[in-house]
Amino acid sequence: MKSVRYLIGLFAFIACYYLLPISTRLLWQPDETRYAEISREMLASGDWIVPHLLGLRYFEKPIAGYWINSIGQWLFGANNFGVRAGVIFATLLTAALVTWFTLRLWRDKRLALLATVIYLSLFIVYAIGTYAVLDPFITFWLVAGMCSFWLAMQAQTWKGKSAGFLLLGITCGMGVMTKGFLALAVPVLSVLPWVATQKRWKDLFIYGWLAVISCVLTVLPWGLAIAQREPDFWHYFFWVEHIQRFALDDAQHRAPFWYYLPVVIAGSLPWLGLLPGALYAGWKNRKHSATVYLLSWTIMPLLFFSVAKGKLPTYILSCFAPLAMLMAHYALLAAKNNPLALRINGWINIAFGVTGIIATFVVSPWGPMNTPVWQTFESYKVFCAWSIFSLWAFFGWYTLTNVEKTWPFAALCPLGLALLVGFSIPDRVMEGKHPQFFVEMTQESLQPSRYILTDSVGVAAGLAWSLQRDDIIMYRQTGELKYGLNYPDAKGRFVSGDEFANWLNQHRQEGIITLVLSVDRDEDINSLAIPPADVIDRQERLVLIQYRPK
């Protein structure tokens, strides 16, 4: 009976965090709008080999993540939930692997359930796991690889070992097809310390080639298909998206070595109090095979991405699955022997909630700021933000009432965030970061437009997805579409600032021409170097400028 209650509680937890509130949040640009539009175009065109964005070749990532996103929109429709359905599914599958692997290592159902809840409630997991990017997919394949390698090395027969390594190769192959060759580097680096400490080199060398073969066979059909269709895909993807992005001096998203330290700290909420003890206990018990394996899968990817020049918070998402298992194991030991870490965790959550309440007041219309984040007419959004932090502090306090028994309720600290964050986003943020909001405000003007031009790829993708059209033209800036725009058949999909006046004269009689520009808050739109317009509609950071036939 207790097991049934636990299962009902887990399903209610998943529903409140990962299902019910998702549709209340508009899509963010540039990431969510980009991936939403790529998948929409895949469904509309029926081309499941070559990814396109705004009708242009888009070679920044392989195909598998787009497949899953497309299936999500096919099943649930072109809506906010449909766009995010794929990443939510991947996150829940990863949580299922956490459950299974914890049960496999310790044979403890309660520990497995706690590891799952800790994983799903970690701030970084929830933030990225409900956000339409490709990282939850690669995380699933990496965690699946972690489980597969363990199965292979623990098998007692050659058939079991062979099956485990073949499965490992499939997960690596799907990882390559999701986000590239990092899906090969991370597993290799993660298992080496364990193999070295356990002296299991023989098994690795005897059976490892099976993983290589199954990985190649997994990638080969699509790899050959896209090479035939687009011969320069692999050159661009390997050199630009891997070497330049991560290793060279001009790498994207350059950041210092210590960049991930604050990411790990913030991402570990509401379980931050368990982080030091979990890592220390893992190191202290490094003679235990399972513990050192989890520790290696936590630390090695973190070090690898810290050394790389290009960094983003999403890159280290896979580290938190083994970390959640270490945290759960440590928490149960602490609850029995010394609950100090659990008390510290409760106080951290109280402090975070109270700090958030104070910060919300400071940036509210009633605070001391001359330019508040929320305006007076957005009072309900301020109260939603207060509720988010109040619930965080409340559940932090509740875990202290009987800490040996109530500490798991820290998982409910982000409940307010899950339910209310979509209602608390300030209008000034929505107007710049949520193209759907802009489309709602300007729908009547946008819909009849013969041509739509914009200077932002993220906004262009949002307009294309909302209006169900892929012919948005880039104006002044090419951004990440630069490579696709270089193809001969992309001629006419970019208009420079100097060419716009002539282009306008040539096309004005064909129908309404709409220009959507991103501007600074204090920028005078009358100073823009464009011909006089018939309509100007400013929505804070986005401006609609329209030219009608004459």
Swiss-Prot record:
**Gene Ontology molecular functions:** 4-amino-4-deoxy-L-arabinose transferase activity; mannosyltransferase activity
Q: Reply yes or no: does the keyword Cell inner membrane apply.
A: yes
Q: Name one GO biological process term.
A: response to iron(III) ion
Major place of residence: membrane
Q: How does it sit in the membrane?
A: Multi-pass membrane protein
Keyword Transferase found: yes
> Which InterPro entries does its entry note?
ArnT_tfrase, Glyco_trans_39/83, LipidA_mod_glycosyltrf_83
Superkingdom as given in the UniProt entry: Bacteria
Supply the name of the protein: Undecaprenyl phosphate-alpha-4-amino-4-deoxy-L-arabinose arabinosyl transferase
